[in-house]
């Protein structure tokens, strides 16, 4: 398993050593993703593949293919995948399909941590959240009680600035297309314009390209534009969508 964070089990507990070791672990995880592919392994409600064991098998297959990390949704999936792969697991909990639906509250984030996520992904927009907390308040609460890394899912440049100001470990363009939670269309590709703006304004920050990365060339273009790492999901792990793309092409 990915090493994660260490707490001395023997001898006198040293706060400074503990903090230094956690800082190193954080840095090692983020560095391990640089220039790499993160694969999102998710199935939508009601689909044949929506089962934790199935998701874990797919995650392991992606690891064998070269994925540097797995991004997954739901507590059972996080736990199952964490038990199957050696690479970091980015966990989230989707609630609904509109508004703030990616790990919308502190409660959801805590549950992802307890399920075994090495990194917790959450919506970084300034939209209202079910528990009334702001994004910044949620991040601060997580920092005060956990050593988990935080991935900020952003829609706009303002969201990216907010995430950087909150010292999030990974900052992603996940929501930039402003599409529904269930979106399997094959269309415009990743948001290279936002990616370039973010990497120019924040050089050295781990800006992740996510959203509509449908081909290897899309992934390469994102890295060339300055992405720290690239997330692809549907094009790799969602056979219903992939099949529909082929079928539609034959009908044109």
What residues fall within each predicted segment?
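Hydrophobic faces of well-ordered beta-strands that scaffold small-molecule active sites
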Residues: 37-41, 70, 89-93, 120-122, ...
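Solvent-exposed alpha-helices and their adjacent loops that cap or buttress functional pockets
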Residues: 27-32, 113-114, 144, 199-201, ...
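Glycine-enriched alpha-helix->loop->beta-strand junction motifs that scaffold or abut catalytic
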Residues: 85-89, 115-119, 144-147, 165-172, ...
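Active-site-adjacent beta->alpha loops and helix N-cap segments on the catalytic face
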Residues: 49-51, 71-87, 99-107, 124-142, ...
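Alpha/beta catalytic cores of nucleotide-metabolism and tRNA/nucleoside-modifying enzymes
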Residues: 12-26, 44, 48-49, 191-252
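Conserved N-terminal beta1-alpha1 strand-loop-helix module at the mouth
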Residues: 15-114, 150, 158, 162-165, ...
């Amino acid at each position: 398993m990915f090493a994660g964070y260490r707490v001395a089990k023997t001898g006198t507990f040293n706060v400074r050593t503990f903090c230094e070791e956690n800082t190193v672990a954080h840095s090692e995880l983020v560095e391990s993703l640089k220039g790499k592919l993160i694969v999102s392994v998710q199935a939508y409600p009601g689909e044949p593949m929506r089962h934790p064991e199935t998701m874990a098998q797919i995650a392991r297959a992606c690891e064998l293919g070269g994925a540097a990390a797995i991004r997954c949704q739901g507590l059972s999936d996080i736990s199952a995948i964490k038990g199957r792969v050696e690479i970091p697991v980015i966990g989230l909990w989707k609630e609904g399909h509109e508004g703030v639906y990616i790990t919308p509250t502190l409660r959801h984030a805590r549950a992802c941590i307890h399920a075994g996520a090495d990194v917790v992904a959450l919506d970084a927009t300034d939209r209202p959240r079910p528990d009334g907390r702001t994004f910044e308040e949620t991040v601060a609460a997580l920092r005060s009680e956990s050593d988990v890394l935080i991935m900020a899912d952003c829609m706009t440049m303002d969201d990216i600035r907010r995430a950087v100001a909150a010292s999030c470990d990974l900052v992603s363009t996940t929501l930039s297309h402003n599409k529904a939670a269930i979106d399997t269309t094959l269309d415009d590709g990743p948001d290279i314009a936002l990616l370039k703006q973010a990497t120019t304004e924040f050089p050295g920050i781990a800006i992740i390209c996510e959203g509509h990365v449908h081909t290897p060339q899309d992934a390469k273009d994102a890295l060339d534009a300055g992405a720290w790492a690239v997330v692809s999901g549907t094009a790799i792990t969602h056979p219903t969508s992939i099949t529909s793309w082929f079928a539609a092409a034959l009908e044109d």
